[in-house]
Regions:
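Short strand-edge motifs at loop-to-beta-strand transitions and within beta-strands
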Residues: 41, 73-77, 269, 281
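Short, surface-exposed loop/turn segments at beta-strand-coil junctions that are enriched for proline
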Residues: 80-86
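Solvent-exposed, low-complexity, repeat-rich "mucin-like" stalks and linkers
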Residues: 26-55
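A short beta-strand micro-motif common to beta-rich folds, especially ectodomain repeats
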Residues: 86-98
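Bacterial Sec-dependent N-terminal signal peptides
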Residues: 4-31, 102-120
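GH16 jelly-roll
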Residues: 111-358
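Surface-exposed binding patches on compact interaction domains or structured appendages
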Residues: 47-76
Length: 358
């Protein structure tokens, strides 16, 4: 039956019934290799079709078509600067009728800047806060919670802006600024997470921070486990905390089932950092399977060894993510009350850098 049908169709065909042949597309290059700095490239296009156009896959690519006529012209490709330390790729598709021709675009990774780190460590992630006006949503996540969510703190954490339009986070003059302010009777502030879904396991992590002033402030640079289930069993690492009621005294703490402040077994240390609320100072952690050490301006703040006592004492062999926040009041920040006349206040961060062993 199929053979007969094919024979009848074949016998009844004529030249006028032949399908229109697919258009042929030619381009003078089928690949673009761009440096991290980016650049502009021109690709010549011709087609036997009646018209042509392009489709772009890659947010770092901008393409414009300059038509000589319906069957020829140039594609102008703009490749944006790559600030990430990863190679990235995109694809430009030229279309004419049912025909397709692709142009592959590959861009080199940005070179890792030379930053000071312990010997044997290399930079794996950083944010210098020198691009744009808001945090990169691919790297950072805002917490959203109402007041008294934790530690009896008085602030409401919101995503970028308060209901009245006040910014709780912004990038300005090369710094991340976390603002805490009062609006319509409520306190608003920011709490942000770096790489909350993947975090890092071990490394040297450093931030440069200028702390806010005022009775009631409670800024922190700390870490929590990616796969969090319960506290303190899963651990908490406080690289730096300060409360405005005790200005310029910064502390580091480790929390676990075997050492927690609720039963006065916490692992913590406090030191005076002159000008912590007036200038930028560095706060860091060097974290391995064997030991955790925190630093203030390169000086050891706290050092704690893995004593081989199990997870109750050392739940720090899992990935943790970085947290920056500015709390107001609460069990510690408001232990002697708060002074709302200090508001608004700002915590400034110059950079966050993560290094791991090569």
């Amino acid at each position: 039956m199929l053979i007969t049908l094919f024979a009848l169709i074949a016998c009844g065909s004529s030249d006028n019934d032949d399908p229109t042949p697919s258009a042929a597309i030619t381009v003078d290059t089928e690949s673009i290799s761009a440096p991290a700095e980016g650049g502009t490239y021109t690709v010549k296009v011709t087609t036997t079709g009646k018209e042509w156009g392009t489709y772009v896959d890659g947010s770092f690519l901008k393409v414009s078509n300059n038509y000589t006529n319906a069957q020829a012209g140039n594609i102008v490709v703009e490749v944006e600067k790559n600030s990430e330390m990863n190679v990235r790729s995109g694809l430009i598709t030229v279309m004419s009728g049912s025909a397709r021709k692709t142009i592959a675009v590959t861009q080199a990774a940005a070179e890792a800047p030379e930053y000071e780190a312990p010997a044997g460590y290399s930079l794996v992630w950083h944010d210098e806060f020198d691009e744009g006006m808001e945090l990169n949503s691919n790297d950072w996540t805002h917490e959203v919670q109402k007041d008294h969510w934790v530690n009896n703190e008085l602030q409401n954490y919101v995503n970028h802006v308060s209901p009245g339009g006040g910014k709780v986070t912004e990038i300005k003059d090369g710094h991340l600024r976390i603002h805490c302010f009062k609006e319509n009777g409520k306190i608003y502030s920011g709490r942000v997470y770096a790489k909350v879904k993947e975090g890092w396991k071990y490394g040297y992590i450093e931030a440069s921070i200028k702390l806010p002033k005022g009775k009631g402030t409670w800024p922190a640079f700390w870490m929590m486990p990616v796969n969090f289930h319960s506290w303190p069993a899963d651990g908490e690492i406080d690289i730096m905390e300060e409360v405005g009621v005790n200005p310029n005294y910064v502390s580091s703490s480790l929390h676990a089932t075997a050492h927690v402040h609720s039963n006065n077994t916490q692992v913590t240390h406090e030191m005076y950092c002159a000008g912590a609320e007036d200038d930028f100072h560095t706060y860091a952690i060097k974290w391995t399977h064997e030991n955790i050490t925190t630093y203030v301006d390169g000086k050891v703040q706290l050092s704690y060894d893995n004593r081989g006592l199990g997870r109750d004492d050392w739940p720090y062999d899992d990935p943790f993510y970085v947290i920056l926040n500015l709390a107001w009041g609460g069990d510690w920040g408001g232990m002697n009350g708060v002074n709302e006349s200090a508001l608004p206040v700002t915590m400034e961060i110059d950079y966050v850098r993560v290094f791991q062993k090569k």
